[in-house]
Amino acid sequence: MTRRIFIGDIQGCRDELERLLEVLRFDPATDALEPVGDFVNRGPDSLGTLRLLKSLGAGGVLGNHDLHLLAARRGERQMKPADTLTEVLKAPDCDELLAWLRARPFIKTWPGIFLVHAGLSPAWTDPVAELSGLDPEIRHPNIDVATRLRWCDEQGRMPKPETDPPQGPGYRPWHEHVEGRFKETIVFGHWARPGLVRRKGLRGLDTGCVWGGRLTAWIAEDDTFASVPAARQYSPF
């Protein structure tokens, strides 16, 4: 039986990804691999991660670190001290890998499931319409929601500046605003602080591998989880 395997934020942790796939006995001929975004950055092997995911025919959605990489390639972003993307940008197959990465959408759907990197605004009634057809190279407020959302108010307004926790009243974790609102289960990542999220209609998979936590998978068909510990902490909080 085909399994849909959703993977939390990998962020260049290729070794942990390979170990998790071994634990899952992943078979690319029958299983569908769907990362939640942030394929790259902060971890030790972003280049190897992209090559592996591409070779396995992975799907997935774009995250904020993926957008940062694409913008850096266009010369629109400067590298930050914590970035680990130089190896990707210097690779002979960089353009091929980034073309593959750029083709990831901001939302994917299956019957009963939404996949998005960060979250969905509580103001949205049709997330697919809000996020379909957006160009990752053109700034759009809905892209910020899909790739950066953590806290918001009940109208979906994000705090400015984006502090964690935010200053000011009315802000709550976005998923508390939308819990039970959609008939679909929302699979997401991006925010390691809450850890594994398993609530009604919510599966949050960012368990902080790059920070020394774990890399986590959710198997949709039987609603089970699998994870492996990080070999070490790759990036400071």
What role is predicted for each listed range?
Residues D9, D38, L53, G63-N64, ...:
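Divalent metal-coordination and catalytic microenvironments
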Residues A32-G37, M79-L89, Q155-P165:
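Short, basic, glycine/proline-bearing loop/turn elements
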Residues Q11-D15, N41-G43, L67-L70, K108, ...:
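Active-site environment of divalent metal-dependent phosphoester hydrolases
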Residues A129-F237:
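Acidic, His/Gly-rich catalytic cores of divalent-metal-dependent hydrolytic chemistry
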Residues R4-Q11, I113-G119, R203-L205:
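Active-site-proximal beta-strand elements of phosphoester/diester hydrolases
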Residues M1, R25, R51-S55, F106-T109, ...:
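A short acidic-Thr-Gly-centered motif at the start of a beta-strand
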Residues S46-E154:
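Active-site neighborhood of divalent metal-dependent phosphoester bond hydrolases
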Residues M1-L52, L56:
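N-terminal active-site segment of His-dependent metallophosphoesterases
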